[in-house]
């Protein structure tokens, strides 16, 4: 194990949406050099094969209602190992900059004078659009995108989302972690006059061979989820750009 008391640095690395081949070259390189890799539950285990044989690999959970480590415990672990001079990686699914609780962890690290380097990953929404062969932007159909989290409903108590502004402020809307609160989210869309005919795609296990898609409308998707027993982890993309996928399939 490499010890260097002057390092005191943590790499926060995006593991991408799941497909190991979508891991960036830089992420692969730092994984090969790491002494300690602290990873989330949604990271594909195949990605850990890039770690050197004697690296310590620690799973910290982070699935809904099943956190093996609290956020504070994770931060403490990162700080402790970095202060020992070990090469530390915090490995997160997707891109850590999008709904990855990055802010909480980097503030803790900075407060202890620990340097960080963030290595972005491919976020799941991009993998979904690539798999289904539609763009997230289009000159006629979608010139703006909004990223939302479906978990905001039950977790946030202040500064709640201004749904009417958000829904009418973007052509394409991407909702991560949508499944648990899907009925509430659909109700919000409809309550501000959003069309029940608006296209939506719901995706589970983006980029992996076991991926699962549901294509429908705002008005039909809840029934489709119930009928198909669709499960997490999943995200939704809403907007007219989805129609390009259907057009391509007909060609």
Swiss-Prot record:
Its EC number is 2.1.1.107. It holds the Pfam family TP_methylase. It catalyses: uroporphyrinogen III + 2 S-adenosyl-L-methionine = precorrin-2 + 2 S-adenosyl-L-homocysteine + H(+). One of its GO terms (biological process) is siroheme biosynthetic process. Its main location: plastid. The keyword Glycoprotein does not apply. S-adenosyl-L-homocysteine binds at residues 17, 93-95, 123-124, 177, 206. GO terms for cellular component: chloroplast. Keywords: Chloroplast, Cobalamin biosynthesis, Methyltransferase, Plastid, Porphyrin biosynthesis, S-adenosyl-L-methionine, Transferase. It is found in: Plastid, Chloroplast. One of its GO terms (molecular function) is uroporphyrin-III C-methyltransferase activity. It is an enzyme of class 2 (transferase). Pathway: Cofactor biosynthesis; adenosylcobalamin biosynthesis; precorrin-2 from uroporphyrinogen III: step 1/1; Porphyrin-containing compound metabolism; siroheme biosynthesis; precorrin-2 from uroporphyrinogen III: step 1/1. It comes from the Eukaryota. Belongs to the precorrin methyltransferase family. It is a step in the biosynthesis of both cobalamin (vitamin B12) and siroheme. This is Uroporphyrinogen-III C-methyltransferase. The gene is cobA.
